[in-house]
Amino acid sequence: MRKLTILKPDDWHLHVRSGGELQSVIGMSSAQMGRAIIMPNLSPPITSVEQALIYREEILGALPNGHTFEPLMVLYLTDNTSVKEIELAANNEFIKAAKLYPSGATTNSDKGVTDVSKIYPVLESMQKNGMPLLVHGEITHKEVDIFDREAAFIDQVLEKTIKNFPSLKVVFEHITTKDAKDFVLSCKDNVAATITPHHLLANRNNMLVGGIQPHYY
């Protein structure tokens, strides 16, 4: 075999940032991918339909000449996200999901959700409108070991959330543990997960033995 032809793939979790960073990286994605789910954790974050549409235009304007690429926009959930905003997003053709970042869990997550119960009305609206919830699944409590954060999130947050909203479409993003895999497989078909290739091939020993190897992070 000398040649393998595949359909142009999509990227289901993409950070392109904004400004100069966007200009630097977008071409590498648009050269290979047809569409991408665009992460909304900018500073400030993309919390409204209006902001998402402006950001979409910025991305399209940064594409290299001749590239065709469709950014699929996502809202960043906060404690103050309104049901009205979710309804607007659910009825907008360019916005495909909303993202749950536990406050303090990752880059630009300081304005994320402090307690998932605070957004239950929002989740109810998302369930009603068929809008997917993308989840960064990590507990940030200091007493939880950093390598147990994903499993603790399942036990303390995600399991209860799915029980309360059984028809909500949920994507547990970039999972890293057997706990997460087993949990998703135990759920109904409206709960799914994404996993990166390096998390299939490497573990924390690859990252830490002989000194920190950051590219295995």
Summary of predicted features, one role per range:
Residues 11-12, 25-50, 66-78, 94-108, ...:
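Divalent metal-dependent hydrolysis catalytic cores, especially in the metallo-beta-lactamase
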Residues 19-28, 80-92:
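Short, acidic/polar
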Residues 30, 56, 60-63, 90, ...:
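N-terminal cationic-hydrophobic initiation segments that often serve targeting/anchoring roles
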Residues 85-100, 106-217:
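Histidine/acidic residue-rich metal-binding segments in metalloenzymes
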